[in-house]
A protein has these predicted regions:
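Sec/Tat signal peptide C-region and signal peptidase I cleavage site
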Residues: 18-22
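Outer-membrane beta-barrel translocator/channel fold
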Residues: 53-55, 59-61, 71, 75-153, ...
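Repeated loop/turn-to-beta-strand initiation elements of outer-membrane beta-barrel proteins
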Residues: 41-46, 75-80, 131-135, 206-210, ...
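Residues on the lipid-exposed face of transmembrane beta-strands in outer-membrane beta-barrel proteins
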Residues: 32-36, 66-70, 122-126, 141, ...
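Flexible, solvent-exposed coil segments and beta strand-coil junctions
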Residues: 41-49, 85, 92-106, 171-180, ...
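Residues that define the transmembrane beta-barrel architecture of outer-membrane proteins
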Residues: 26-28, 60-62, 116-120, 188-194, ...
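Outer-membrane beta-barrel transmembrane domain signature
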Residues: 139-247, 251-255
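Bacterial N-terminal signal peptides that target proteins for export
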Residues: 1-8
């Protein structure tokens, strides 16, 4: 009887998990990078990344980055770099109200559009080893410049009044008397953020495998450290040889910032690094 109850509970848990997954998006993030070390302290790297979203059917962004790092001490490392980002902004809907601020008068519906971004980062990473575990904390400052962009915008205005017999336009279950397709100019802007990451890595004795888990949170420095996004990752680094490294992982990301979709996402990441 107890076994049946356990089986039933396990089945219900799986169903709940499946329901949760259905409410979130799924993506695949792939990356390729190269790294060159100059002695034991200084190294440079370059890499490209591609992210697919909407159940891994549509591109969300791709980027190219250059970076460098310097080990000040065995436990302390400094880093800096530049990343060019080509990102897709998803549809955004903003309700419009009358002067009273309460009565709905319509919607502005911005279509999807692509935007270029330029990012500089500076970081400090501290780490400590305990047995076969390595604990690390990275604090990264991000400066991102958003280029100007243009998108299509649907403007729905004026709710249908009693006795109206003209054309109507339906959006979000509401009928409107006016509709206009226009373009909207997105102004260039700058953003400053702090991204903190805590990671625990384990070195498996006798195997070239290092499983790890990490938690990362990003806060907006220009808005009183407002929460932007968080990311949980569980992965496995496989050192195939001294020069070839593979990285596999699962990511769950939640965000309040709508720059790239304002949604929760489950993602599988696959990365390859070549070390000169």
């Amino acid at each position: 009887m107890l076994s049946r109850k356990r089986i039933l509970l396990a089945a219900l848990s799986l169903l709940c998990a499946g329901s949760l997954m259905a409410q979130n998006d799924f993506g695949v993030w792939t990356s390729v990078s190269a790294e060159k070390s100059f002695g034991k302290k200084f190294s440079i790297d370059a890499g490209v990344e591609n992210r697919l979203q909407e159940n891994a059917t549509k591109p969300l962004r791709w980027d190219f980055g250059l970076g460098a790092s310097y080990k000040v001490r065995k436990f302390l490392k400094l880093g800096a770099g530049y990343t060019y980002i080509r990102g897709r902004n998803l549809q955004e809907v903003k309700p419009r109200y009358k002067n009273d601020g309460v009565t709905l008068n319509g919607y502005n519906v911005d279509h999807e559009f692509w935007r270029n971004k330029h990012r500089l980062y500076f970081d400090v990473t501290g780490k400590v080893a305990w047995g076969r575990f390595t604990f690390s904390l990275r604090e990264r400052y991000l400066y991102t410049h958003y280029n100007e962009a243009e998108c299509l915008r649907d403007k729905y205005r004026t709710l249908v009044q009693p006795g109206y017999t003209g054309d109507t336009y339906i959006y979000n279950g509401t009928e409107f008397m006016e509709h206009e397709l226009t373009t909207d100019q997105k102004k260039a802007k700058d953003k400053h953020a702090l991204r903190s990451r805590l990671q625990v890595e384990y070195n498996i004795k006798g195997l070239p495998l290092n499983p790890y888990v990490s938690y990362e949170v990003t806060n907006d420095l220009g808005n009183q450290l407002r929460y932007d996004k968080s990311r949980v990752c569980a992965g496995l680094e496989w050192k195939v040889t001294k020069k070839h490294i593979l990285d596999f992982g699962y990511i769950y990301q939640t965000e309040s910032d709508n720059d790239e979709g304002n949604s929760n996402i489950h993602a599988i990441k696959v990365g390859y690094t070549f070390k000169f």
